[in-house]
Curated annotation (Swiss-Prot):
Disulphide connectivity of cysteines: 177-230
InterPro entries on file: PBP/GOBP, PBP_GOBP_sf
Location within or outside the cell: Secreted
Keyword line: Disulfide bond, Olfaction, Secreted, Sensory transduction, Signal, Transport
GO terms, biological process: sensory perception of smell
Protein name: General odorant-binding protein 45
Record's GO cellular component terms: extracellular space
Keyword Disulfide bond tagged: yes
Source superkingdom: Eukaryota
Leader peptide range in chain numbering: 1-22
GO terms assigned for molecular function: odorant binding
Amino acid sequence: MELKTCCIILPLLCTLTSYAEALDHAAILKSPNELQLECSKYLPSIDVSQNVDCYDRCIGLVGRFWNDSIGRPAQTIARYYQPDTGSQDHITRTDQCLCEKVLTVPRNAYCQRASSGLQCYLDNYGQLLTGTPQFVPVTEIRAAQIFWDCAQMLQISRDRLTQIFKDGYNKTSEGRCLIRCFLVRAGLYSDRQGPNIGRFAVQCEGYTAEYEQAVVSCYDRLKKESLDSCSLATRTMDECIQGNQFSSSDIDGLEKLEVQ
């Protein structure tokens, strides 16, 4: 199987700005109720001019499980549901519904496709966990903020930060510690427990049992090498996450740094 490209987005340094985060790191967790409340503040329930309800599309965008270019809910939407215990065909039923009620809708009818997609999950996948916060994937903008935040904490100048990414972040101890800081601050990794597989699965859309086992086996192998904390974190990202052949990610891959 072809190796998937990296799902952690490294920022364009020319767009980095300083950013103040809460003390509990920068991970964002939101429940369906919170997604709905947030969208209710952004837009009315009905676009009067076009008579189209874009509320569900907004929920998908804020929860990072909807992308107009794909036109159907990402696999990550499943984290908001408890599958039906009495049936094992909830995935099949949901996929069938998506084929019949989403893929038949014109590609540019984004709001209609989003609403139909969410309805398929509500009707077929299981119980919506309305009050349970779930991890929201890191976007490119947030990644840039977190990296610059880490650079400030590690006393890495902007010029040096640019050089680290230009030369390769895994080439120096500074670069490796920068990656460790990013992973910890993004809520994807800890020195005590290693990679948070559930959150990485959301970030990289790797949901199979093979994906999880590959991460566990890879991390266990690296721990036996008695690496320092920064090297362990960086190699975990490089070898266990971004080199994971079982990731089904349709998220933008790791982007090579372009310094202007």
